[in-house]
Amino acid sequence: MSIDQSTAAKVAKLARIKVEQDALPALAAEFNTILGFIEQLNEVNVDGVEPMVSVTPMRLKRRTDGVSDGNQQAKVLSNAPDAREGFFAVPKVVE
């Protein structure tokens, strides 16, 4: 696959990058160089290689899903300008 100047201009427009008309040939050449490197990856034999996400084994620590009130009600309501009966009190905005 080869990138021409019109494709390079389209990519620049999609990326919201202003590229002058005289810089398009160089941009197209850079895109072609990048695509060449990517094509080299297609030549690598990866048969039998297990896909991996990280070079170090990482596991997420799991915890049980439990519902709680957070035990923060008094602390949260202390910041409210008006709190009544454990709730935020706000002025009526709809008639």
From Swiss-Prot:
InterPro entries: Asp/Glu-ADT_sf_sub_c, GatC. GO terms for biological process: glutaminyl-tRNAGln biosynthesis via transamidation; regulation of translational fidelity; translation. Keywords: ATP-binding, Ligase, Nucleotide-binding, Protein biosynthesis. It is an enzyme of class 6 (ligase). It catalyses: L-glutamyl-tRNA(Gln) + L-glutamine + ATP + H2O = L-glutaminyl-tRNA(Gln) + L-glutamate + ADP + phosphate + H(+); L-aspartyl-tRNA(Asn) + L-glutamine + ATP + H2O = L-asparaginyl-tRNA(Asn) + L-glutamate + ADP + phosphate + 2 H(+). GO terms for molecular function: asparaginyl-tRNA synthase (glutamine-hydrolyzing) activity; ATP binding; glutaminyl-tRNA synthase (glutamine-hydrolyzing) activity. Signal peptide: none annotated. Its EC number is 6.3.5.-. HAMAP family: GatC. Allows the formation of correctly charged Asn-tRNA(Asn) or Gln-tRNA(Gln) through the transamidation of misacylated Asp-tRNA(Asn) or Glu-tRNA(Gln) in organisms which lack either or both of asparaginyl-tRNA or glutaminyl-tRNA synthetases. The reaction takes place in the presence of glutamine and ATP through an activated phospho-Asp-tRNA(Asn) or phospho-Glu-tRNA(Gln). Belongs to the GatC family. Heterotrimer of A, B and C subunits. NCBIfam families: gatC (TIGR00135). PANTHER family: GLUTAMYL-TRNA(GLN) AMIDOTRANSFERASE SUBUNIT C, MITOCHONDRIAL. This is Aspartyl/glutamyl-tRNA(Asn/Gln) amidotransferase subunit C. It comes from Ruegeria pomeroyi (strain ATCC 700808 / DSM 15171 / DSS-3) (Silicibacter pomeroyi).
